[in-house]
Amino acid sequence: MRLQDFTSEKECSHAIKDSNVVINCIGSKVYTKKDKDFEDSNIRVPVAIAKAAKAAKNVKRFIHISAAGADPNSHSRRLRTKWLGEQEVKEIFPNVTILRPTLMMNNIHVNPTLAGKFTMQMKIFNRMNWLIEGMNGKVEPVFVNDIALAVINALKMEETIGQTYDLGGPHTYTYEEIYEQFFNVTGVKPYTNLVKFEDALEYYHYKWYQSFYRQLFRTWLFPEFMTMEAQNLIVNPKNKGFADLHIKPVSFGHKVHEYVQEINWLYNSHDSTKQQSANN
């Protein structure tokens, strides 16, 4: 079912009329441009779904996917609105189970992820990896399948009702270390170039950049995405996590080869022979 307006409680009610479980996975992208878009995705949509779930007599469980690091004082618009969305949802549906993943990685659609950024840098910048100066936060990458398993286990366990879980991978990396792993697996010598944040913003606003190059780099040069790499997206050890859901998450190191297969496919997309070899 495709809704016209996810912020409409009426449409959400129609969508869940035959459901006893509601799972909200809707969220803003890190390259969303307007404050309204963040508020719609992270606050208004969850509120509409929570109200619809509360009003539906047959809905027994509500799972809300938020984000680790959600904080009202964060410099990130995404994380600020994620926190506000959590508070609104808990007020409407107190029995909601909130899952807060860190940096999610997947090998289905790598383009809007760090693997996608790495691929673009290989194709356009001749294998050079650039980081914004002073923005090398720590992160605990988590595989998207582990988040899906967390949802399933949460639904099976009644003790998860009304609880919040921080879900992160077993190891902590800096963003530079993640890119270095990509380099090492692809057999390319690591080379990182630091760019001042002011220079990146100036480049983003160049007139010649507004057409073709804006479309090409729009994801990676949005200020929200650039500053994301300054954030520490790690779990709070005081909060409940994967262990409480009886899950041992897969480490980034074990999955990096799968990500690189997708990187190779994108990087060699002009060559059908290389496409086939990358997928073997």
Each predicted region: which residue ranges?
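Short alpha-helix in the Rossmann-fold core of NAD(P)-dependent oxidoreductases
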Residues: 39-43, 63, 82, 140
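Residue-level signal for the nucleotide or nucleotide-sugar donor/cofactor binding architecture
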Residues: 7, 41, 139-142, 170-173, ...
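Oxidoreductase cofactor-interface core, primarily capturing Rossmann-like NAD(P)-dependent enzymes
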Residues: 73-188, 207, 215
